[in-house]
Amino acid sequence: MGQKVNPVGLRIGVIRDWESKWFAGKDYADFLHEDLKIREFISKRLSDASVSKVEIERAANRVNITIHTAKPGMVIGKGGSEVEALRKALNSLTGKRVHINILEIKRADLDAQLVAENIARQLENRISFRRAQKQTIQRTMRAGAQGIKTMVSGRLGGADIARSEYYSEGTVPLHTLRADIDYATAEADTTYGKLGVKVWIYRGEVLPTKKNTAEGGK
C-alpha cells in the first residue's frame, strides 16, 4: 500500500501537518476553492522564486499565508515592495484581510518540490534526463538525505513510445510511517510534449514525542 499512496497524505496526522489549517461548516467548499485560487495565483506569480509550499490559516475575516521559499529576497523585494504588492493582489482576489509570512528554506536540495522543479527545468533546457537525475541525486545525498528516488516519465529523448525511467540511491522506506519522506511532482514542457517528474526524498526518522500523563491514584 505504501508503494501506491501519496507518501505525504499517508503521514498527515502522524508526523506531518495539514497545509490548510482551518475549520468550516457550510462555507467549506468556498474556502477550499479559495485556497486553490490562492495557491495557483502564488505559484504563477512567484514561479522563479523557488516556492516549495504555501500554508493557509483562517480566522474570522482574516487569511494568514505562510510562503516557504528558497529565495526570500525575491519574494520580499526591495524594501518589501514585492510582498506588499502580492498582499494587495491577494486582498482583492479573496476580499479578505491577508497577512503574509515568508519562511526561508535553508537546504533546498532536501526539498522534494524544489528538486523536482529543478529536474523539470533541466529537461526543458534539453539536458539528458539521465544526467539531470544522476546529478540531482548526488547533490541531494551530499546535502544529508538518507535516500532519494527520482522518476521521469514521457517521451524520453524524443522516443515514439513513452516510458518511465527511475534512479535511486540510499533507502526510501515508504511503508514506515515514522520515516520523514518528502514527495513532489513537476512537469517539463519539451518540444516532444510533457514529461512528468516525481521525487521521493528520505530525510530520516521522526520519533514521536512521549506525552507525560499523570498516573491516577498515585
UniProtKB/Swiss-Prot annotation:
Biological process terms in GO annotation: translation
SMART domains reported for this sequence: KH
Signal sequence segment: none
Family as reported in the entry's similarity comment: Belongs to the universal ribosomal protein uS3 family.
Description of how the protein assembles with itself and partners: Part of the 30S ribosomal subunit. Forms a tight complex with proteins S10 and S14.
Physiological role: Binds the lower part of the 30S subunit head. Binds mRNA in the 70S ribosome, positioning it for translation.
Name under which the protein is recorded: Small ribosomal subunit protein uS3
Organism per entry: Bacillus pumilus (strain SAFR-032)
